[in-house]
Amino acid sequence: MIVCIAEKPSVAKDIARIIGATTARDGYMEGNGYQVTWTFGHLCELKEPDDYTPMWKHWSLAALPMIPQRFGIKLINDEGIKKQFATIEKLMQAADSIINCGDAGQEGELIQRWVMQKAQAKCPVKRLWISSMTDEAIKQGFQELKDQGEYQSLYLAGLSRAIGDWILGMNATRLYTLKYGQNRQVLSIGRVQTPTLALIVNRQKEIDNFVSEPYWVLATIYRDTQFTATSGKFTSKEEGEKAFSTIAGKPFKVTDVSKKKGNEAPPHLYDLTSLQVDCNKKFAYSADITLKLIQSLYEKKYTTYPRVDTQFLTDDIYPKCPQILNGVSQAKIMSQQKYLPLIQQLATISKKLPKSKKVFDNSKVTDHHAIIPTGVPPTGLTDMEANVYDLIAKRFISVFYPDCKFSTTTVLGEVINEDGPKPEKIEFKVSGKEILEPGWRVVYAKDAKNADDDDASDNANGNADSGNGAKKEVVEERTLPSFTKGESGEHQPTLTEKWTTPPKYYTEATLLRAMETAGKFVEDEELRAALKENGIGRPSSRAGIIETLFKRHYIRRQRKNLMATPTGIELIDTIHEELLKSCELTGIWEKKLRDIEHKTYNPADFINGLKEQINNIVIDVLSDNSNRRVTIMTEEDLKKKPAAKKTPAKKAPAKKANKAAAQNTDSQNVPAQPAPAADPMVGKPCPLCGKGVIIKGKTAYGCSNWKAGCQYRQPFSQM
């Protein structure tokens, strides 16, 4: 008898139907020489500390670090799991061979291997490796079964990850809880969750310590078009007024008019992170909700395997694309066959689907390709599932459309003042764009009318705010009047006072991008390359990490913004071991784990390195003689209304200078704002480091020496 083991009952039933195992038994299906059983995700886990020795049952600093001689696994303590495992064990011990039908990935491999080890399976094992749950994919997968030994390095990488998380998490959590937790709550430390929390805390500190400063922008309106000075902003009002005086009453002259045509390629297909980002921006879905929705669509056979980190397809998918598009065209979303016109229009553009390297690239795909529709027309979707399917379907359709073609017009101008001994010149510039052929943008034409956030290429081409404020420019239409080089005339100059603004708080969308592209936070080139591929955590785990931070009361949600709680802030401040809270930790781990998977690094060396690392951390923390403690937030604390933010008492600057006043040399700039009332705290020596002085942020006082490591922070609400 051949025993097949799947990761979920629903998946097992689909497989059983395809291979003819149609008789239902208690915990499995049987027929045609097969027995198809299932797990419920993880049935096994690594043993707890007290499973190794009674000395580790009670939390004690003296027992740290806890390093078992040999790591073992055990059944999760659940009656339903125990019953199902008994069925699996009985089937496997009598089996002639086993087919591992777990999810095709590192975690899926680990789940099934542990079950087979616990059941003491001795027979040969084959591996089913598929990227979708359609009947065709399952049939093809059974025709192309692999020997499980081909995936041994994948299993070893997953096992090393689990053991590493145990060594770090179990020891560091007990260490920090006992040392700094006031015996009120567990202070959870994790390889992924702690660097993620540090991202949120550090961003919040940047905002709290931010001091808004004024600057001035010189512009002028010529023929109802606003030109901006190319010299940039002025940090001094006097400099701005001087430049304004130079151009007031002098003619404006157009010095150059240039046009340049360009193309904008369709956005990349979705991987899990980019899908979660878009769902958060467009529908305010959390990363965890999006993962559940796309997992549901996958299990219903409407989309391909979701837990992926690539945005490319393999070449063998290309011949199947016409059939997939045909299936998508028949889909009815909210009672509308909305994709049929788009696919029909695609057929009029080209007789054969284009095959672009930006879509099909074998070198960019490892275990699974990007998330795409399977071609099975969806029925009975919830509104939330329909929203997610709509994103995936439109993205897939759009990659076969031509590029969007546009024309960029740049107009340069100048104002020359020859009244003085030496002529003075101020140069200006304005740019506009005109879409010549919308190309793939027709797929998103209706979406673009709804809101600015619905722009199709935002995030998809890496345009999302990833934590440093950088955002790639996208094509937005702005048509300029026709200008001629050499023309001149009157203009209306303005000098506008503005204020610098702090960074934005993370949302789930921008945090996911920061987790994915964490390479920008480290200096080492090799680590940066590893982080670009793997980021902080894996695509499938990031949603869970964010949810864990909420459950631990380390962060809270204020509208769409993610805010660190006092517990979260103080925990990060308490952790002096940079390796625990920096992106470099994950970079080091991910690179070594990837090397294990590629058979170029020894798992034993990985584990031994972690043992040495945790031993050093324990020594360092135990030698800390300070009386630092972490404030523990309770559920009731989080329910209390946050204190209102206090900001420096200054009026918002005027958005635009008065045109008439701008032409008057006696009133040639925006009126100066009244100076904020003097704050007696500001400027005093820092009571913590003694090197900096106290500065005033948006919600708290801080130290001017904060970038150098001073952690002084006094919230306004505690004054």
List PLM regions with ranges:
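Conserved short loop/turn motifs at secondary-structure junctions
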Residues: 1, 102-104, 183-186, 259-268, ...
